[in-house]
Structure formats: structure tokens, C-alpha cells
């Protein structure tokens, strides 16, 4: 057996091979383990011959013992193997590895040493915070002494780096070997691997970055240090470059506070090592794919090697193992693995796929199978043990079987268990439903409240693993209010309200709720009976001392009255609660715990069910949509347990229903912790379902504002608990809400549920709840006259002018009627006393406020996210705090996309922020609305384009607001004021339903001058003038009539889009002109420059004529400020004029001055286009609805004209112009899909590279029709690869047969896979849009489909090359044919060899490969060199394979036939 090469031989080796690797395991030790151990010895500087003796094994164990607790898996395996070999040498009989390790540790007292070392903390040699004993720093005589690393440790580190070649194993090896090391020791480990300079350079860069970050965050104190005080370590000190060993020891053990510099430095090095490992292992696990003939075992080895190098959490790696390992397998293995079911083990996958591989692998496998078969024949089948005696299932006797029984056949009911009838004839109902359970076998499991209180909205963490199984027969009694105090915490002063909150128990009702209680120290099994008033115990189960006082009592029951003894003040322990109460002792058939004990324990009978009085709202999916079918992503153990408990309770309350695999839909579910970090919240990712669900209209368009509430004497705020879960969901829609809770480690199938109520996160829940609650409240309002109810979602504001008693009565009526409808209002969410928290506001009897605003100080780091939050707080505060500005603060965020990007405050923003800090420090209050008083809105200008306004009644502020929106680039204050007043009026109509009287800071004359011409820009109500310091005024105005006697300036400008060059100028009626050349400009900028030139060169009064609507729109609005510097200069020039008349004329209409100036500025810049074919293009578009690119090419129209024709067509403006693109795909790849329209099936095939489509209407979506369409496609176009979804028609045998016959590779798409059928899905949408545009022109859908296909293929141009899909496809096929032909010609050239001479060297060299042949020279390639040789020095011959040696020039000249053949080929090559 090869024992000569191992540490054991003979009988010792036989004993070794009988020892099991694990307790009760099947695998045993083999000789290969000994060979492996011998090789591993070198890593630790030990000789393999030490394994041959007991003393040698003892030395190995002494070396490995300190490293074993923190070592890698390989090190632990070596330690275990040495223990087994030691036991064999010592003739200690052991059965498995675990027993051998225990034997060795007991023999050498290793366990006692560790235990004693743990007890003696003062004598420990390990620094604080560690567990390993392998430390270079030891405590000797209460002083810390450094011991250098041993050569064995350094040798092991070097061998690891050399053997693993910076694999993923290097990082854990470094962690194990450097445990407890100082920075000096870590640098020593890095120095011994000095040959790897590239890796060390990366490590150095990471260490330098971390050291710099340390210095930035740990700045040394200012000034000199006191005498004897230890300085704080810097980044270079931690790295060991500027610190000594003694300083490192002092910082680690004696400093106050202590700084473990060694551990900190190890973290930096580990970060660098991870970066090095990632660089040396560039192949990602996502790129690992199994080859077509690669054995599955080799693929798994490569996959796990790449997985170890991934720097990802373990849960992510688990997910990669579960999904990517199967997803990236080849088709043969993938087909086998899918047949294994959900989440197979790796061992099952390896066994199932062991036959997949190339011929060599299959031959090797066949040899192994044949050898195993021969061994089985030699060994023979194993015999089974003796069979037991036969037993009859009819009479129960031994010796014969049921079919041989002579006794009459007994019929047994499987429902009640009785003999004589069958289950279908049973009249007894459920079997043993009221049977008294034996006391010893019905103990209910303990379930604590702190672990039990899970709900959809929150659950405690962690959940209890000993949960009780649920029942399908009846929902259990659930107690979920409050929390249970610990044993002995209850006091006599506990109030009834406090006692009612302690719930800790859940019992299923599929059997009697029996519970073990302790009465005066005696355990008693009793029935928890919520229908019994008293607690009655049988005399045989409970005995009290004779001297304990009692009194006689008669209690009534179903069978009549019974005499009992009543003992008072008896102590009863139920779960973790101790209750004192009365106990009755008598002849009761069963022990009963009544309500007198259960009520003190805080138990309730909760039946959470959906209300049957609320009608379901019918909901459906969008047309053509289907429900979500998404895979559940991996979850951690604690999340799975939390979700299990949440769903179990919701199922018991009727909010969820358990379903199976028959429901094909699924949505991912996950859990997050609430803010208090003690409870869990379940979240379902309904994004895909929301896309497919019909659209809803939000019936409540906004949040009610407290300024719109009227002042009332009595106010109560209540909240509807579990609002959504009380409203039933449409039964037909429930199947789409299905989700799955996976099992840990995939130990079983997931638990699937679907919602019976409105789920959170679904887009229909808010609308349905709002509408349902509104209908319920309408009925409630009729029963509560004088009570005003304001509702937003589940928050209710109840107010009245009644006295307190009557108001509370009406509130109780509201709560009672809501409860009748299934809407519960918990007591803890009822607010009866001020201040009332409502919708983020604080309501008081006479005022309302918001919570105190605390703005963070300016010092410190500011990111985009932090500033966004501050701006949100300021916007919220601006409804009550006047004067808040955020313009400059928001300006800092422009162009910033990364939320964590740091922001540097500008001076303006900093001043603005400090001003806001001063504003929010003062408390502001708002009043309530009085409908009898006048509503006034006052506006103030704050400067810098920011405005503020207040709504008041008789001087009391209702609310405030601000306005800083600039809608146009060029604007003036009057236009902004008009928009602001419009906003104020909309806000007043929304909150109070009436218009206010608006007070504006503008002069009446100024406003009228502007308003008479521009009244159409907006509508505003009546307003009045208010004298404030910042009055709005017009800085200039334009006259309406031409100024007589003044010169007229015709202005124009032109620019080229290509060169960005332009001209601007003017020409006056009196012959004055000026032309100016411009660079890097546009048409609009040139037009504005011309106006500016005319204003500069004219007098105080001027007439200006332009043909630019852009210029007219800007200047006629009289802007006073602009973001454009050029417009700002024009405004300044206008202010200097006394009168300006501005007129517009159409261009190119032969108008005198306009035509002349247009020719002057257009010369050399642009061409005047004469658009004669516009009408022809319009007619063609009305017929085919082609896109603008097609009209540009066919009719020679400018882009802007062609786009205008498309924009004017109402049928082309549904979703705008689609943008065409091209995906990366081969030329013979097609995608196919079926879509539905008007109740018919349209099958569509798209050529991925060109976008060309084939489509037709088919009778049925079957495999036969799909295969027939595929044959048509194959007859017309080359198809080598077909990609579809995994629908039944595409995966049918008919399609598979056509693919086999046509040699077509067929693949199917997977959700979230890059190879999904995205192209054909996009074409489906485009085809439907074209059909909708031409549907009125066709009688039948079949005709419309063919017409739409023609339009798409031939009339829509764009994408690659700017041509149509049909042109692109033909072009690609032609190009492919040309390339194939050219490749054949190139191949002919490559079949020739060239012998050549260089310079004056007479020796012929070669042969070289011919690349190109011209008239005067040839291009050849010899080895890696490419050379150009004159024709006179080159001889070309045809390569016929092996030939005789040619040693003369004549032999080469003799092959003139080949040269002639090359002449023709070279001509073709020259043309190319």
C-alpha cells in the first residue's frame, strides 16, 4: 500500500485506516492523508520523519498547539492528524479524530493549562483583547518583554506566499501568523518577502493612505508635552518607521488610553493584501463559465478558487454559490441541475454531472465505473438482516398477513377512528375534538412576549426559535399587547391598565389550550378557559395545609352546582408571571384556570380578522401585463426568523393566506429594523407589481394644513391602527401579491403566502384606503352632528364646540363605529389633551406650531446629502418662519450628483445660512382660521429674486410662505410678481376655499403701465398698493408707434452650425451700416449682438426692425435682469435711451432693409433654402408616418423643417420620436416574441443588428404556428441564432425540430440577464405605435400589421448610418459576402512562400510568408518581423507541403506557373 513512503506501516497503517474522520461518519483515513501531512511539515520548518515516532509527534503537537485556535483550516487538519498518529504510536484505541484530539489534550494537560491561564488574568502572556497564545510580547515579572518572531513562523509565511502566489489564502494566513504582533514584527514579515516588489509597492501605497488618514483624524495636541508624558502615535509611528519597539509596547499596554498600534497596523496591511490578492486574481467569479466539454468538477474548482478571492460578505458569496454556479454552467449540466429541484447540495450536483465532459473525461469515468463494477462482483451483494415476524393489519395477530386473515374484514373510519363505518359516512365530526388529553403529553411550549410580538409593522429581535406551529382548522387565540415583565417584578400598586398590557403567550386552538401552572409550588396541568369566571382545581392535584383558612362555596356549571372550597390569597405562577388570587378546590372533571387569574396575567382573546362589512374594490392588471415572477433574493437567518414570526401572526389574523407552488407569481420580501433597533418591519418589493397594476387616481390631493382649521373648544386626535390590513383586497387580485420566505441553508421549501388585505408598498393601497375610509366616515358624520372630522389617510382630527362630556361621547361613537367596520383605534394612539401631535404639527387650543428647528453648526464636514436635508428642514420651517432664504444654499448643489461629495460653503451661502439660524431661534406661532374675518395676503420683496408673503386675519398670522422660482432666463419683477400672486391665490383656494385681498409692493401707475399690454400672461385678483422700501418699478419701456424723424435700423445676424462662425450687423434707411464678424457663436447670439450694435451707434431715440422672434420675445417683456451677459448689456443700453421702438418683420419676404442686411450677414455664412418639396413631404408623411430623418434624405429638407412636419402630425406625438440604436449582436442573430393586440396574436421576429422585423398575425400561440413562422423566416433570411423567452410555444418540440433542421442555435432569456429579449420587446412597442397611427386606414388587423412592418423597415430612417432597417440589413449581408470573398482571396495569397535576399548578401533567406504583392515590391512576414523586399530580390513559390531541398536559383525560377497565378491575385489585391 505504499507504506514505505508514509509515517506508518503494517498493522499501524491498518489501524490508521479504520479510524473515522468524523464521529459517526462514513469516511475513514487513507494513506494520502499521511503523504499530505509529510508535505505540510516543510511549511513549519519540521522534518516529515517526526511523524514516525511518538516523541516526534509530541514535538509537532507542541509547535502547533499555540497556533491551533486561530489557525486556518489546513493547520487545524494537520494538528488533528498528528493527534491521530500519536494515538496509534502510543497504542491508544480511538474511533475518530475528535476522540484522538481529546486523548492527546488530556495526556499533555492542554485543557487544564488553558483553563488555568484563563483564570489567572494577572499572569497571562497575552495582550488584552486576544485569545491566541502565540504572542511576541510576554509578561515577565510584571514587565512586558518583546520576543522576536521565530524562523519557523517567518518560513511558514514565505512558503504560503510562494506556493499560493498571492491567492486568497494569503490573507487568513497573515492574520493567523501575525496575531498579537507589534508593528516591528509585521514589518519583519513584509521584509522577508522582498522579492515581490510589485505587491509590496501596492501595500506601501495603501499604508501611506491609511497613515495620512490617521494623522488627519488624530491631530496631536498643541504645545509641548509635560515631562514624562508619552506622546500620541502618528501614522508613521503605527507603521513602525519612526517608533521603537519599546514605544510600541508602551502604547499598546501602558498608555492611557491604550492604543494597540500593532492591531491597527495589521488592519492597514490586511487592506493592502486584499488589494494585492484582487490584482493577482483579476478573474471575477461572474466571468467563470463552464466550457462546452469541460468536466463539471473542474468548473467547480475554478469557480470556488475565484470565489475565495472575491472581497464580498459571506451572504453574498452564498448567493453567488446558489445562483451563479448553476447559471454559468454549460447547457448539458444546466439541464441536469435544473432537474435536481430547488437548492441542491454541491455533492448532489457533482454526482449528477459527473458524466458531462469531453471524450477523455468520459473514458476516464468509464474506467472507474468498470473497476468499481468488478469490485462489486468480487465482493458480492451484502445480505440484509433477518426479517421480523409477520403481523396482520386486520386482526393485529402475528404469523400471517392481512390477505391471509380469516377474521372478518374490519372497516375503520379515518375521521373519528371508530370501527364499523367509513369516513364518508361519519357523523361524529372531528376525531377526539373534546377529548381530555393526558396530562403528561399536552404541555404547550413556552413563548415569551418579547420574542413573540411580531407584526407586519414591527417585530422584536431576535425571534424565538421555539415557535408554535399554526393550524389550518382555526386561528389561535393571540395575545400581543404590551410586554411581559420579568419574574417577580409585579407589585400590588400595579394598575389595571398596566396589568392589561402584559401578554406573553400564544396557544393554538387545534387542540385544548392546556398549560402547566405552578400553584403554591405544586405543578398542575390545567385548561385555560376564558369562559370560566373562577379557577377550579381537582382535590387530587392540589393539597393545602390543614390550617390554611377556606370557606365553602357552591358554583354552577353545565352539569349543575358543585360544592367547592375557596382559598384566598393563593400564589399562582403562569409562565413568567406570579399572580395572587382565589382558587376553588372541588370535584371538577378537569382543572380550569378562569378569568380571575387570566385577567391579572393581562391575557386577551384577540381575533384579528378582516371586516366582512367592507366591500372589496375591484382591481385588475393593465392590458397585456402579467403579475411579477421574480426570484426571492437571499436573506440572513435572523431576517428569515423574523419574517416567519410576522407572517405567522398575520396568517392567524386572516391577513395572509398560505399558498403552494400552484401560484406562479412571486415578489421579493425582506426585513429591516425599526428606529429603536429592537423590532423588525417586513417590506415587500412591489415595484414590478406596481408597473403592471392598473392606474389609480389619488382621491386626496394634498395634506390638510392647520391654518385651514377653525378654532374649536374640544379637540381629539386619533389614529387608525393597522389601517391597510383592515381593508380586504380583491379576491381575483390576491394571487399577484404572493411572496416566499426562504429557509436557512435551503433545508426545505420556502413558505409561500399571499395577501388578503391591502399590502404596504402597493400603489393601490392609499387610494383604496382613502376612498373606503371616506365612505365609512360619511356614515359616521350623520350619527355625530356638531363634530367636525378631518381625515388624511389613517390620521383623524375630531373637533367640536360641545362640552367635554358630550365631545368624548361622540368620539367614542366614532371609535365604536370604526371598530364595527373592522378599523381599530388603539388607546395609545388617542390624544385627548394638548398639545396634539398631528401631521407633523403641534396643535394647541388657540395656536399651532411646528417642532423646534435645530440647524447644525457650520463647522465640520458638509456633503450634498447633508445640505439637502438642511434645505428640506428650512422649506418645512418657511411655512411659519418669515424671511427664510435658500437661494445661495441651493446654488452650491448645482451639478453635484454624488450624495457623499463634500461641499465648500460660499460666502453668500454662509451669510444666508447664519441669517436662517437667527430666524429659527425665535419661536413662531400660527393661528386658526375664522371664516367671518377678512383674509389678507401681504407680499414683500427680499431681494436677489426672493419673495415672502403672509396670510393674516386682523393682524394675526395664519401661515407664511416664500417664492424664489425664476421661470424665464430673462425676466422682470412685475412678471415674477404676477406669478407669485397666482401662486398665493391657488394656495388660498386650496386651504380656505376663498380668495384673499392681496397687498403688493408696487406703484399703481407702474403696474398699470405694464399690465395693460401684458395682462394675458396671468390672472390675478383685486389688489392694493402697499408702501414698502423695496418697490417694484420698470427701468425702461418701449413705445408702441414708430418714432417720426428718427433713423430706422434693420438688424440681423447669421451663424454657421458647423464652423461656429457668424456675422452681425445693421443697415439704416439713411445709409449707415456696420458688419461685425463673430467667433464661436449661434444664430440667436448673432441676432442679439446686432441689436446691441444698433443701440450703441444710435441716438437717444431709435427705431429698430428685426426678423427674429427670439429677440422680440426677450425685449418686449422689458426684462430688468438676465442670466445672459449679452442680454444684460442690451438692458443697460436700453436704460440709456429715451424712446425705443422695436418692430418685427418676417424674413425672406422681400422687405427692403431686411433683405439687404440679410444678404450682408449671410454672405459666406449660410445658404438661403428654397423649400419647394415641403408639400410633397407632408403628403408622404400623412401616408406612411415616416420619421424626420427619412424626409431629410428623400426630399432634401432641413432638419428643423422635417421635425416640424412630424411635430404637426397628431398621430406621431403620443410618446415622441423614438431613438433608434443597435445592440451588440452577430449578423445572423434574430429575436422572436409574441405580442397581443385586439384579442389576436402577433408574432414578431427582429434582426438584432439592423432592427429589421418580420411580423404576421397567427391564429393561435402554439408551437406548430411558431415553427411555421420560423420556417418562413429561415426561407427568406440567414438565421444561425434565435433568442426567445421560455414560453411554451418557443420551447415546444415543433420549434426544436425546425432549429435542428435549420442548424439554428436556440437560446431562451432569463430575467435580469444581459441576453434577454430586449430588442424584440422594444420592436413590439414600436410596431403597436405604428399600427395605432394607420389603424383607421385598414379594415383588418392583418393588413395593418403588414403595412406597419413595411413602414418600419423602409420608411423609418436613423440609427447606425442614418438609413432604414431594410437598407441596413441588406448592407450588412452584402458586406458579409464581400468579406468572405476577400478572405478567400487573402487565403490564396497566404498559400505562397517567398525566398529573398537582403542588401548585398548573396545568400537566399526564407521561406517567409507572403502578405502582399505589388508591382515593384512584396511585403513578407518572417517570424514576428514584417519586411518590404524589392521584386527583383524575391522569389515566390507555391507551398505544396514537404518538398525536396532547393539549393540552386534555377530550381526556384522553375515554378513560373505559380508566379503567373500570383500576377492575377496581386491585381485584385492592388484594387483592394
UniProtKB/Swiss-Prot annotation:
Motif Nuclear localization signal, residue numbers: 26-32
Identification of the protein by name: Gag-Pol polyprotein
Amino acid composition bias (Polar residues), ranges on this chain: 456-469
Segments of this protein annotated with the region Disordered: 115-135, 215-234, 454-500, 1440-1472
Chemical reaction(s) catalysed: Specific for a P1 residue that is hydrophobic, and P1' variable, but often Pro; Endohydrolysis of RNA in RNA/DNA hybrids. Three different cleavage modes: 1. sequence-specific internal cleavage of RNA. Human immunodeficiency virus type 1 and Moloney murine leukemia virus enzymes prefer to cleave the RNA strand one nucleotide away from the RNA-DNA junction. 2. RNA 5'-end directed cleavage 13-19 nucleotides from the RNA end. 3. DNA 3'-end directed cleavage 15-20 nucleotides away from the primer terminus; 3'-end directed exonucleolytic cleavage of viral RNA-DNA hybrid; DNA(n) + a 2'-deoxyribonucleoside 5'-triphosphate = DNA(n+1) + diphosphate
Ranges where the record places region RT 'primer grip': 836-844
Residues annotated as binding Mg(2+) 1: 719, 794-795
Pfam family, one: RVT_connect
Other facts: This is an African green monkey isolate.
Organism per entry: Simian immunodeficiency virus agm.grivet (isolate AGM gr-1)
UniProt zinc finger (CCHC-type) residues: 390-407, 411-428
Record note on domains: The p66 RT is structured in five subdomains: finger, palm, thumb, connection and RNase H. Within the palm subdomain, the 'primer grip' region is thought to be involved in the positioning of the primer terminus for accommodating the incoming nucleotide. The RNase H domain stabilizes the association of RT with primer-template. The tryptophan repeat motif is involved in RT p66/p51 dimerization.
Residues annotated as catalytic: 529
Site (Essential for RT p66/p51 heterodimerization): 1010, 1023
Cofactor: Mg(2+)
DNA-binding region extent: 1392-1439
Zinc fingers typed Integrase-type, residue spans: 1172-1213
Binding site for Zn(2+): 1181, 1185, 1209, 1212
Record-listed E.C. numbers: 3.4.23.16, 2.7.7.49, 2.7.7.7, 3.1.26.13
Modification after translation (UniProt): Specific enzymatic cleavages by the viral protease yield mature proteins. The protease is released by autocatalytic cleavage. The polyprotein is cleaved during and after budding, this process is termed maturation. Proteolytic cleavage of p66 RT removes the RNase H domain to yield the p51 RT subunit.
InterPro entries: Aspartic_peptidase_AS (IPR001969), DNA/RNA_pol_sf (IPR043502), Gag_p24_C (IPR045345), Integrase-like_N (IPR017856), Integrase_C_dom_sf_retrovir (IPR036862), Integrase_C_retrovir (IPR001037), Integrase_cat-core (IPR001584), Integrase_Zn-bd_dom_N (IPR003308)
PTM annotation (Phosphotyrosine): residues: 135
Binding site for Mg(2+) 2: 1052, 1087, 1107, 1158
Function: Gag-Pol polyprotein and Gag polyprotein may regulate their own translation, by the binding genomic RNA in the 5'-UTR. At low concentration, Gag-Pol and Gag would promote translation, whereas at high concentration, the polyproteins encapsidate genomic RNA and then shut off translation.
Cleavage (site feature) positions: 135-136, 366-367, 432-433, 504-505, 607-608, 1049-1050, 1169-1170
